[in-house]
């Protein structure tokens, strides 16, 4: 079985709606394979929301004008196609726009229902004069890709209901390039640099995660043909490899106090790997193993980048009473008493 080093993925946030992702190292040729697949999926298959039809008070079709409104109905529809919305509802929802002149009508004048958000409230829709009045009913639906107005034309729709071209994709632009990168003595590995720009309705990070999930589901169809088929197996990342090496260390290397060390040895915990498999509750069940011993173990594991099974990843040694992070020592007030340093039981 061929084992490849696990690639890492990093994100460089450029703006609120644009990020650059770097995936490396990839086996030669896989930069283009992965980059092209992700780009296509990001542009065509990320679910989003869009306006599918509108109804303007006093208007029967799009080839007309509204009294007191500078733009004709066709221009208003073109503007509404640029509306950026998100919806948490699977079913169609209705938004309303009511504005009386004079003044500019923007997307911020739209009143969305609960679960629907307008992300570009400053977008221009129309301009009203002193006598202008605009009342619009907008239907928003969820979907993928691009759907032309002719497909949004519902049979039996009421007179005056105007279908609109729907651009569901929340992704504006995706580009990628592949550079060479070095792994040990080899310099022919690929580094994929993916630039993702989205609308404000979704972050680039979430868009990439959605694309990855879609591809995993689709490629899983081929995998199911023979789950035992041989392929390239992704090995651990350098950080994971360091953790694996740490698991084999004897607890002697943690330099624990005698009490903590003896308690763990008596319980049959001989390696770091066996220790991180325990929870705080498991350790507290050990005779003579108290909260101070728990704190000591958590600090020692934190220094290796590890933690107990149920410890939160945000553990901060500086918050442990009596422990000085700078010197790695315990103050008198928070220190272990003498019996913690005296061997309490012969093993």
From Swiss-Prot:
Keywords: DNA-directed RNA polymerase, Nucleotidyltransferase, Transcription, Transferase. One of its GO terms (molecular function) is protein dimerization activity. GO terms for cellular component: cytoplasm; cytosol; DNA-directed RNA polymerase complex; peptidoglycan-based cell wall; plasma membrane. The keyword Transferase applies. CDD domains: RNAP_alpha_NTD. The keyword Transferase applies. Residues 243-347 are annotated as: Alpha C-terminal domain (alpha-CTD). One of its GO terms (biological process) is DNA-templated transcription. SUPFAM superfamilies: C-terminal domain of RNA polymerase alpha subunit (SSF47789), Insert subdomain of RNA polymerase alpha subunit (SSF56553), RBP11-like subunits of RNA polymerase (SSF55257). InterPro entries: DNA-dir_RNA_pol_insert (IPR011262), DNA-dir_RNA_pol_RpoA/D/Rpb3 (IPR011263), DNA-dir_RpoA (IPR011773), RBP11-like (IPR036603), RNAP_asu_C (IPR011260), RNApol_insert_sf (IPR036643). Homodimer. The RNAP catalytic core consists of 2 alpha, 1 beta, 1 beta' and 1 omega subunit. When a sigma factor is associated with the core the holoenzyme is formed, which can initiate transcription. Belongs to the RNA polymerase alpha chain family. DNA-dependent RNA polymerase catalyzes the transcription of DNA into RNA using the four ribonucleoside triphosphates as substrates. This is DNA-directed RNA polymerase subunit alpha.
């Amino acid at each position: 079985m061929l084992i490849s080093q696990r690639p890492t993925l990093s994100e460089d946030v450029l703006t609120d709606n644009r990020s650059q992702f770097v995936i490396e190292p990839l086996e030669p040729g896989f930069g283009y394979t992965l980059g092209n697949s992700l780009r296509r999926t990001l542009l065509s298959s990320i679910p989003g929301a869009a306006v599918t039809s509108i109804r303007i008070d006093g208007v029967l079709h799009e080839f007309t004008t509204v009294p007191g409104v500078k733009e004709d109905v066709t221009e208003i529809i073109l503007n509404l196609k640029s509306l950026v919305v998100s919806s948490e509802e699977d079913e169609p929802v209705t938004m309303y726009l009511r504005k009386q002149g004079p003044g500019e009508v923007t997307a911020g004048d739209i009143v969305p229902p609960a679960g629907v958000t307008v992300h570009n409230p400053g977008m221009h829709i129309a301009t009203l004069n002193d006598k202008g009045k605009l009342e619009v009913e907008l239907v928003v639906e969820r979907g993928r890709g691009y759907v032309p107005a002719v497909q949004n034309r519902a049979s039996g729709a009421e007179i005056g209901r105007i279908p609109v071209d729907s651009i569901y994709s929340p992704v504006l632009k995706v580009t990628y390039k592949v550079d060479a990168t070095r792994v040990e003595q080899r310099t022919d590995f690929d580094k994929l640099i993916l630039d993702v720009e989205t609308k404000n309705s979704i972050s680039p990070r979430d868009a990439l995660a959605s694309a990855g999930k879609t591809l995993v589901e689709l490629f899983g169809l081929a995998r199911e043909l023979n789950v035992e088929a041989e392929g390239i197996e992704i090995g651990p990342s350098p950080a994971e490899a360091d953790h694996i090496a740490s698991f084999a260390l004897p607890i002697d290397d943690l330099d624990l106090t005698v009490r903590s060390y003896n308690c763990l040895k008596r319980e049959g915990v001989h390696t770091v790997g066996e220790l991180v498999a325990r929870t705080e509750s498991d350790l507290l069940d050990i005779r003579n193993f108290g909260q101070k011993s728990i704190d000591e173990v958590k600090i020692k594991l934190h220094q290796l980048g590890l933690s107990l099974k149920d410890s939160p990843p945000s553990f901060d040694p500086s918050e442990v009473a009596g422990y000085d992070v700078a010197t790695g020592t315990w103050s008198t007030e928070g220190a272990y008493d003498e019996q913690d340093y005296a061997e309490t039981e012969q093993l």
